[in-house]
Every structure is written in structure tokens, then in C-alpha cells.
């Protein structure tokens, strides 16, 4: 049965709606600065903006973070590297509901031990029962369990800690469990709010702290995209290596001797033997094929401060075109400065015959007291500058005189018409 026109249009619309791999998407863990037992798990493509929403600086906070007695909130850890919004939401739900998630191995789960709690300050175990959902130890244990699962352990994710006490709980838990994380999962520490006063801590939290320094755009692969555009401009002659995605994936997996994986994490280029990350390559390809708007935004030049919005590059180039200025530009410069360019080169060997050089421009050279003196070292030159109206009248007279000279020269040249031809 042939597809209908409506189904074809739906397929076309769905292809147009396909977006490139997002530049950044993460799952985060919030902790109340007032009550450390209050924790929250969420996901966002912009952690700094989302943190401002939770703290009430922007609209759009979650219902559980609206209570003023729990604000401000701090972002203590994030898990980034998701290739889509759906993948981040899937991991977020599994982190929030680890017990009912199909990716968690509950048989060998050490979280089920009752009374297991680790103090963030000392790093020692605390006796007594605690609510699994509000315990920091339980949340980090769930995170460790998901990252060891067969499903999420293949993902190119990265765990980043912004708080030293939370990272201490994480390290203590690693010593209590037998399972280890995959070598491809990186754990990074980025402490900036520890070892400072409470006032400085609140100021950093108001500005999102170290969370605001995260690169949530495509700036990290800007040079990569620019290089690919430069090499692919000439479609007939490409000097770099080209291969199918399936062939390149097989080449990367062959180097690692891995039969269970279908998508590699990284590999070696067969041409230059350089290290290539699969996520970076796929992000560049999807950005080049599906994200033309993102590419234009990435290479858009920022307008300089103080430059009018409607001023283009053409008007800027016109400022420095040539060394000279037009007549209108020179007049405008003279009116704005109020000064004339005076040539003080003497007309003869006598330095006091400068009247002939500057007399046409309205300058008067004289000695102090109006008397001539034999001592040249005591002589001074005083220039009387013209006012703009006088200068304009003088310029008009000068132009009239020039036009008169040109007419007279033309008349004199016409006298050759009456000349006799001598044979």
C-alpha cells in the first residue's frame, strides 16, 4: 500500500523538527543551604539559569523549591554528557526512582541496608534509620548504582562535584561497595565555595558560583565545525579522510577488541592516528546537517559597544578608505576643531618674512611691542585665528578666484583658434 499524502507530509515535518545533539544537558542535585537534609534532583540544559529559577531570581521554579525558608539552594553535583533531552529525562527519572527502575540491580543493591548513613562532615557512618529519598548517602549510592548498570555504564557521561563535603560522602561510599565504575565515566571536582566566609558564600550563590562558568554552548567544538566547513567547501577535492559512520565505528571497536559494544566512545583516526571522541564527531555532524541556525549563531560577530545597531560593515570600512578626505569631510573637521592648518614655512631666507606664508590664512606675524628687534631669540610669533564665518567667506572668495583663473585660462587657450598655420 502506497503512503498517503498526509503521511508523507507528517514524515517531512518530523524530519524538519529533528534538532542537532544538544550542546549541554545535565541532571543536577540541589541542596538547601538552610537545611542540608532537603535535596532535589532535576535536569536542565542551562544549570545557571535553572539555579536562578530555584532561588526565585527568575520565574519557573519547581514546586518543591518554592519554600522561602529553604532558600537559597546550591547545586552540589551534576551528571552531564547526555546526547538528547530524552536521555537526560530518562536518567533523571531513574535517579529519582531507583528502586522501581529496571536498570537498577536490586538483588545486589547495598542501598537496602537499614541504618546506613554517612555524615558529610566527618565521613563516618551514623547509626539510625533515615528516609531513603532525603538522605544524601542514599542519593549518591543510587547514582553509583545507575552508573554501574549495563545500560548507563556505556554512556559518555561525566560526574562533577561542586561541594567538597558531598564529594567526601561519594568517596566513602566507593570504599564500601565492591563494584567499580567504567573507565569511560569521568569524575571531576570543581570546588569554589569551600574555605570562604559565609558572606562570600552567599554572594557566589547569588551569582550561581562555579555553575555559571560551565560551557553550555557549542564553543568547545567551534574550531572543529570551522575546520569541517573549510574542508568541505570544495566538494570535488577533499584532502582529509572520509568514511562511513558504520565503517569508522567498526574500526574504533576493532582497536578495543570489544564485541559487546555497538557504539564506540572514542578511537584513533586511521589517517593521522589522532584521538577522536565519538560524541564530538556526532555533535559536529548533527550540527552541520540539522543546526544551521545554531551554526550562524555560533559564528555571529558581536557588535562593538557604542556602535549603532543599524551600522554595517560597509560604513565601517568607508572610514578608512584612502588617506585623503573629501571636501565636505575636511570642512566638517575644520569646523569641529575650530583650527586651521597653517604652513609656517618661510618664503625667503629671512625668518621674519613669514607674513607672505600665513598672510593668506589670516595670520599676522609680529614681534612683541610691535617693534623689530635685532635679537632673534626674543622674537615670538602670534597668530590671530579666524572665526568660522570669516573662514567660510574666505573659502568662498578663494573658490571664486580659482574659478575665475580657470575661465581666463580657457579664454587664453581659445586665442589659438585665430593663429595662422605656417607651412
UniProtKB/Swiss-Prot annotation:
Instruction: Report quaternary structure and partners.
Output: Forms a heterodimer with SLX4.
Q: What is a GO molecular function of this protein?
A: crossover junction DNA endonuclease activity
Q: Name one GO biological process term.
A: double-strand break repair via homologous recombination
Q: Which cofactor does it need?
A: a divalent metal cation
Name recorded for this polypeptide: Structure-specific endonuclease subunit SLX1
Which UniProt keywords are given for this protein, alphabetically ordered? DNA damage, DNA recombination, DNA repair, Endonuclease, Hydrolase, Nuclease, Nucleus
Q: What is its EC number?
A: 3.1.-.-
Family stated for the protein in its record: Belongs to the SLX1 family.
GO cellular component, as recorded: Slx1-Slx4 complex
What are the subcellular locations of this protein? Nucleus
Renumbered to this chain, the signal peptide range is none
Q: Briefly state the protein's biological role.
A: Catalytic subunit of the SLX1-SLX4 structure-specific endonuclease that resolves DNA secondary structures generated during DNA repair and recombination. Has endonuclease activity towards branched DNA substrates, introducing single-strand cuts in duplex DNA close to junctions with ss-DNA.
Which organism is the protein's source?
Paracoccidioides brasiliensis (strain Pb03)
Principal location: nucleus
UniProt-listed InterPro entries? GIY-YIG_endonuc, GIY-YIG_endonuc_sf, Slx1, SLX1_C, SLX1_endonuclease, Znf_RING/FYVE/PHD
Q: Where is the GIY-YIG domain?
A: 23-105
Region: Disordered; residue ranges are 300-334, 365-406
Amino acid at each position: 500500500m502506497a503512503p498517503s499524502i498526509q503521511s508523507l507530509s507528517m514524515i517531512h515535518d518530523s524530519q524538519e523538527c529533528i534538532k542537532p545533539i544538544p550542546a549541554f544537558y545535565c541532571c543536577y542535585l540541589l541542596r538547601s543551604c538552610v537545611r542540608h537534609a532537603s535535596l532535589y534532583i532535576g535536569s536542565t540544559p542551562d544549570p545557571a539559569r535553572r539555579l536562578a529559577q530555584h532561588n526565585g531570581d527568575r520565574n519557573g521554579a519547581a514546586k518543591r523549591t518554592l519554600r522561602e525558608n529553604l532558600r537559597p539552594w546550591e547545586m552540589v553535583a551534576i551528571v552531564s554528557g547526555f546526547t538528547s533531552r530524552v536521555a537526560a529525562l530518562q536518567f533523571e527519572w531513574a535517579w529519582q526512582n531507583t528502586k522501581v527502575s529496571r536498570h537498577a540491580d536490586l538483588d545486589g543493591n547495598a542501598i537496602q541496608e537499614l541504618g546506613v548513613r554517612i555524615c558529610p562532615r566527618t565521613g563516618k557512618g551514623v547509626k539510625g534509620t533515615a528516609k531513603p529519598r532525603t538522605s544524601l548517602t542514599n542519593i549518591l549510592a543510587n547514582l553509583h548504582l545507575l552508573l554501574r548498570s549495563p545500560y548507563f555504564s556505556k554512556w559518555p557521561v561525566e560526574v562533577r562535584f561542586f561541594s567538597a563535603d558531598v564529594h567526601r560522602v561519594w568517596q566513602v561510599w566507593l570504599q564500601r561497595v565492591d563494584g567499580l565504575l567504567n573507565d569511560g565515566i569521568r569524575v571531576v571536582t570543581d570546588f569554589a565555595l569551600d574555605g570562604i566566609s559565609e558572606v562570600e558564600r552567599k554572594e557566589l550563590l547569588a551569582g550561581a558560583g562555579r555553575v555559571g562558568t560551565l560551557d553550555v554552548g557549542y564553543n568547545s567544538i567551534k574550531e572543529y565545525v570551522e575546520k569541517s566547513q573549510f574542508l568541505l567547501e570544495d566538494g570535488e577535492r577533499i584532502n582529509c579522510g572520509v568514511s562511513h559512520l558504520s565503517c569508522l565505528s567498526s574500526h574504533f571497536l576493532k582497536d578495543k577488541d570489544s564485541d559487546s559494544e555497538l557504539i564506540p566512545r572514542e578511537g584513533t583516526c586511521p589517517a593521522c592516528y589522532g584521538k577522536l571522541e565519538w560524541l564530538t564527531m556526532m555533535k559536529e555532524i548533527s550540527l552541520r546537517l540539522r543546526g544551521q541556525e545554531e551554526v550562524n549563531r555560533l559564528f555571529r560577530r558581536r557588535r562593538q559597544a557604542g556602535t549603532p545597531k543599524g551600522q554595517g560593515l560597509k560604513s565601517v570600512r568607508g572610514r578608512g578608505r584612502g588617506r585623503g578626505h573629501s571636501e565636505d569631510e575636511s570642512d566638517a573637521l575644520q569646523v569641529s576643531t575650530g583650527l586651521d592648518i597653517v604652513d609656517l614655512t618661510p618664503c625667503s631666507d629671512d625668518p621674519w618674512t613669514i607674513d607672505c606664508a600665513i598672510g593668506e590664512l589670516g595670520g599676522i606675524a609680529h614681534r612683541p611691542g610691535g617693534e623689530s628687534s635685532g635679537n632673534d631669540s626674543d622674537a615670538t610669533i602670534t597668530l590671530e585665528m579666524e572665526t568660522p564665518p570669516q573662514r567660510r567667506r574666505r573659502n568662498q572668495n578663494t573658490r571664486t578666484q580659482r574659478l575665475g583663473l580657470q575661465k581666463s585660462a580657457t579664454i587664453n587657450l581659445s586665442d589659438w583658434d585665430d593663429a595662422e598655420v605656417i607651412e
